[in-house]
């Protein structure tokens, strides 16, 4: 049995992750659950927090105290928290699955450096469908080439704190790489006022934050007379949770290194 720990276990995604671990039919088991040290829920049973009934795993407020109790940590928190957790796992030689978004370029370099010592799966989105879309986007960009305008539209719930979403940025990276462009040079984030005519080489991003939208992403390839749209819509966070647990199981026996869901799904 793969021993899995979830950090941020008292949050919405954390509860979904706990449920997904418990749905593996014995292939994995939740052996540790961690949340903020100042959480009033520390000591509560993780299964009860997730609405699953008692499972005998108390919520801890200190990752360092439970590092011997798991093989892989699943982390969907905040960049500042994740970076601290990476150092803990690095010292304890524990694998990680990271779904945190909003990292800066420099922070991603720190993550890559840590992957020299432990195996890490890092992805902006753990949905199987989204990762299939990334493969389709690469093909579409190569076929349609420079003859289309490319726009990426994403929508999420009102509580999401980063924009554009990590998934939207990853989609932009895939398209830009397929076209031989540098996303940092061609990305346009929102438009306002007298913008002038659209430059063909740009990749536009539009962001919506409203209600309880779990996650919608559309990449638009617009030419004269026709357009192609590749869309993914998530209706439940369990989609991401199951993908993250799948990645945690896949990591067993893997060498140190930085992987993503394309590796996990055999799409690379």
From Swiss-Prot:
This is 4-hydroxy-tetrahydrodipicolinate reductase. The keyword NAD applies. Keywords: Amino-acid biosynthesis, Cytoplasm, Diaminopimelate biosynthesis, Lysine biosynthesis, NAD, NADP, Oxidoreductase. The active site is at 156 (proton donor/acceptor), 160 (proton donor). Its EC number is 1.17.1.8. Belongs to the DapB family. GO terms for cellular component: cytosol. It catalyses: (S)-2,3,4,5-tetrahydrodipicolinate + NAD(+) + H2O = (2S,4S)-4-hydroxy-2,3,4,5-tetrahydrodipicolinate + NADH + H(+); (S)-2,3,4,5-tetrahydrodipicolinate + NADP(+) + H2O = (2S,4S)-4-hydroxy-2,3,4,5-tetrahydrodipicolinate + NADPH + H(+). Its main location: cytoplasm. Coiled coil: none annotated.
């Amino acid at each position: 049995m793969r021993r899995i720990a979830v950090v941020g276990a008292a949050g919405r995604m954390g509860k979904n992750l706990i449920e997904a671990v418990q749905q593996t039919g014995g292939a994995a088991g939740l052996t540790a659950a961690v949340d903020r040290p100042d959480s009033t829920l520390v000591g509560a049973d993780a299964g009860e927090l997730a609405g699953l009934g008692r499972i005998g795993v108390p919520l801890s407020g200190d990752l360092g105290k439970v590092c011997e109790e798991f093989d892989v940590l699943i982390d969907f928190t905040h960049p500042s928290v994740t970076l601290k957790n990476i150092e803990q796992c690095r010292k304890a030689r524990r694998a990680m699955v990271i779904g945190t978004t909003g990292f800066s370029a420099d922070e991603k370099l720190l993550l890559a450096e840590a992957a020299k010592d432990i195996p890490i799966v890092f992805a902006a989105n753990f949905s199987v469908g989204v990762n299939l879309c990334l493969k389709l986007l690469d093909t579409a960009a190569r076929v349609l080439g420079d003859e289309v305008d490319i726009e990426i539209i994403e929508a999420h719930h009102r509580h999401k704190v980063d924009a554009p979403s990590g998934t939207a940025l990853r989609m932009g990276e895939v398209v830009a790489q397929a076209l031989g462009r540098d996303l940092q040079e061609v990305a346009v984030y929102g438009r306002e006022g007298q913008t002038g005519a659209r430059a063909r080489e740009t990749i536009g991003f539009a962001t919506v934050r409203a209600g309880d939208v779990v996650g919608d992403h559309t990449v638009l390839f617009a030419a004269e007379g026709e357009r192609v749209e590749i869309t993914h819509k998530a209706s439940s966070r369990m989609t991401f949770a199951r993908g993250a647990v799948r990645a945690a199981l896949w990591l067993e026996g893997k060498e140190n290194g930085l992987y993503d869901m394309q590796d996990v799904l055999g799409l690379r």
